[in-house]
Amino acid sequence: MSGVEEKVSGTTKTPADFLKSIRGRPVVVKLNSGVDYRGTLTCLDGYMNIAMEQTEEYVNGQLKNKYGDAFIRGNNVLYISTVNMTVADGA
């Protein structure tokens, strides 16, 4: 088993499986520049190009802009993380 696979309840989960499972969910996309984009992941391709909806841009932890749709080129992406929603956030 390679270092990028994870055993979850008896099945092997790859990064591709994770990315498929988060489509339509709230995510944080961190860029190499340190800027964060938070919104709903709508599309992701093989080059890690990302389309998001209801996107907010954070610089140094502070909200700078809000966008309806955002398109991020994959070579700028450091990581993609899911957002844990709380009751106060509307989950």
UniProtKB/Swiss-Prot annotation:
Keywords: Cytoplasm, mRNA processing, mRNA splicing, Nucleus, Ribonucleoprotein, RNA-binding, Spliceosome. It is found in: Cytoplasm; Nucleus. Residues 14-86 form the Sm domain. It comes from the Eukaryota. Disulfide bonds: none annotated. GO terms for cellular component: Lsm1-7-Pat1 complex; Lsm2-8 complex; nucleus; P-body; spliceosomal complex. The keyword Magnesium does not apply. Expressed in roots, leaves, stems, flowers and siliques. The keyword RNA-binding applies. Coiled coil: none annotated. GO terms for molecular function: RNA binding. It holds the Pfam family LSM. One of its GO terms (biological process) is mRNA splicing, via spliceosome. Belongs to the snRNP Sm proteins family. Component of LSM protein complexes, which are involved in RNA processing. Component of the cytoplasmic LSM1-LSM7 complex which is involved in mRNA degradation by promoting decapping and leading to accurate 5'-3' mRNA decay. The cytoplasmic LSM1-LSM7 complex regulates developmental gene expression by the decapping of specific development-related transcripts. Component of the nuclear LSM2-LSM8 complex which is involved splicing nuclear mRNAs. Component of the heptameric LSM1-LSM7 complex that forms a seven-membered ring structure with a donut shape. The LSM subunits are arranged in the order LSM1, LSM2, LSM3, LSM6, LSM5, LSM7 and LSM4. Component of the heptameric LSM2-LSM8 complex that forms a seven-membered ring structure with a donut shape. The LSM subunits are arranged in the order LSM8, LSM2, LSM3, LSM6, LSM5, LSM7 and LSM4. LSM6A subunit interacts only with its two neighboring subunits, LSM3A or LSM3B and LSM5. This is Sm-like protein LSM6A. It comes from Arabidopsis thaliana (Mouse-ear cress). The gene is LSM6A.
